[in-house]
Amino acid sequence: MDNLISRFESLGLAPVKAKEAAGNKKLAPALDSLISATGQTTFDKPTGMLLYTLATTVTKEKTPHANYIAKAIATGRIASVEQLSAATKFCAKSDPVANEQVFDEACGVGVVVGDEEIAAGVRSVIDSIKDSLLAERYRGQGKALGMVKKAPELRWADSGKVKSEFDAQILALLGPKDERDDPAAAKKASAASKASTAPVKAPEPKKWEPASLESMLSDGDISRLHKPGENPQIRPGLVEEHLCATKGRVITRFPPEPNGYLHIGHAKAINVNFGYARTHGGTCNLRYDDTNPEAEEQEYVDSILDTVRWLGFEPDKILYSSDYFQELYELAVKLIENGLGYICHCTKEEMNKSRGGEERGPRVACKHRDRPISESLAEFQKMKEGRYAPQAAILRMKMDLEDGNPQMWDPIAYRIIFSTHHRTGDTWCIYPTYDFAHCLCDSIENITHSLCTTEFILARQAYYWLCDAVDVYKPVQWEYGRLSVTNTILSKRKLLKIRDMGFINSLDDPRLYTLPALRRRGVPPQAINAFVRELGVTTATTTINVVRLENHIRDCLNEIAPRVMAVVNPIKVVLENLPEDYFEEIELPFKPRDPSFGTHKVPFTRVLYIDASDFREIDSPDYFRLAPNKSVGLQNVPCPIVCTEVRKNADGSIAELVCRYQNVGKQSKPKTYIQWIADCPKAGSPVRLNEVRIYDPLFRHPDPCDKATVPDGYISDINEDSLKIAKGALVETGLWDVIKRYAATDAGKEELSKHNVENIRVQFMRIGYFALDKDTVLSLADIENNNTGSANLVINRIVTLKEDSKKDA
């Protein structure tokens, strides 16, 4: 392996990336073979990266000519990703050796696009949309750049030069950004320029503008995929049948296995598959890959559909691989009849040894590989009838043991499993593997674009082989990089282990990054969609800092969450100069500077509560909240209060603060305002929370499975203080108004009837964003009858507010 790592580092790969590639049983042999084909031992980084990209995109059609492309890269004939993409497409249909001149023309070999040509090409595009650019200004910049990148005359131009020229021409046309491009900044500048003593209004907060599906899919290779019917088939009639069935429309699918909850990585897959279909006027199916009856559960079937809909997508059809069990069985028989499938009785150890073993030695054919077709058909029938024990017989595909791709080493097509299937019961005791069922289900459904993550790159060759072997329509498989985030793990096996050890309670624990867990925490689905769409679609496998996701969550909640006051750790305050029965209604906005959220009224009385964090017994010059003999403002209350006495319990803890309401005489404006909650039972104040759950990252390190930083394994990296529970927190009555507003909507009634309460989200002012947890006891009847006493409210912190350097002052 060390030799492979050194060899891959010669391409310019970083040591970590080289080690990862060398350990990839699918990628390593392909990349090693391409390096050998070039006849070189050292490469500059651009050349090395192109060879690496080629290794990740080789398919059966391109394999006979992969070495040719590698040599073209090494000699500089293919010098860009665009040229490489064109080369692989050409080689899928034609022989470059026999048609070298045509290959060169198709791939832009030797084409040099000069600076003047770049300028002219960019100018042509900008002139064609000049009116809309002048109207939209910099808001239309992204769309314009996408059009420039697709301009035929700029196809082989240096992308860096194109971008620089584009920026220069946009600046010349529109001038520098001004108030038309940032209205909030314009208002701020206008206010600052006025010589007035009148109070200056705070600038309008910048609107959250999440990335769209169109922006996610408008750049890179995914924006240049084939049109339906352009993908080559083993015979022409298959294309005609396919187009007749699809009417030329795009059809994609999202194919999860129902053996667990979907996670944050699946959010990207859902957006890619459903999004590609939506943006191309097509449809997307939800197909459950339910070929393993031992792993699947109805709970996960229901959860997956619910999660897809929660993210805002609706499948055109809801299908199951098990819908096609009879058809798949018949295709397996056809595979055997074509001499391309055989029944094998080898053990796992024998199969591993025949494939070269751990030493990667020579591969040898299984002793059953050349058994007569009639014998394999008879043995397959015995398997179907349950006359073999599990693992005593399997159906294997007769591919190519000499191929450098391990996916071609006669993979298993069918195996014996004596388990009851969640849909077909005990009808079957033989089940197709993923390798057999996946591509054939795609074919049966006439999928035009089979979009999956890059770990299936080498599986693409076997995917195409099988479709051709049984003479069915062959979809195109295209891969993109999967998504992970830091400070978590997504493996179901590992999550179950930490659950069984008691570190979490369930797989929807709000500290996890399964989608049901994020939903339970209160994360809005539009924030998750915005996060994955902003990242775009590339072939790179990315682990994104979780802070980036949290920023999207925070920005989204800032737009949609009403503001209410809460005190998590209350201290009683008595305003000594107000009468016992003092009562005043204070009108509060649900969101300052946004009238669309409306207002609500809360009581202001002689007794109220503030948070313990807003009081100090020992004052300091840089502290501006409440302290003995010091005043502070109360949010939206006309006058400040000043602390005159601290009363304590026998144990020394604070019993209550005696304060004076400074409503007589002229008072200086307080430097700070704090939240408060009135003690007014007749007005239902305060609203008492049973629990406030404060969540922090479950793991301490960005990668809990990295042996270099976490040598004792991911269990040792668990933050045992990642959940804090506060009892006795108080909230103003505005929370109940928010709940009643939600319950008054049709959508709210429906969700509450299913006990889905996570859509009830608020900002606790100066604290963070929160949502009701499913452990809340809250009925529609209680809400309609204003029966707050029987409610048992449990609330989760979704995310903190943005860091504020003055928050502790």
Task: Cite the ranges covered by each PLM segment.
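N-terminal Rossmann-like or analogous alpha/beta NTP/dinucleotide-binding catalytic cores
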Residues: M1-A365, E455-W478, R482-S491, L496-F503
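Glycine- and acidic
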Residues: I251-G260, C284-T291, S443-L451, D509-L515, ...
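Hydrophobic/aromatic-lined pockets within catalytic cores
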Residues: R278, R309, I336, L340, ...
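Active-site cores that bind ATP or allylic diphosphates and position pyrophosphate for catalysis
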Residues: N338-L495, F503, I553, P562, ...
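Core subunits and conserved enzymes of cellular information-processing
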Residues: F456-I457, Y464-L466, N529, R533-L535, ...
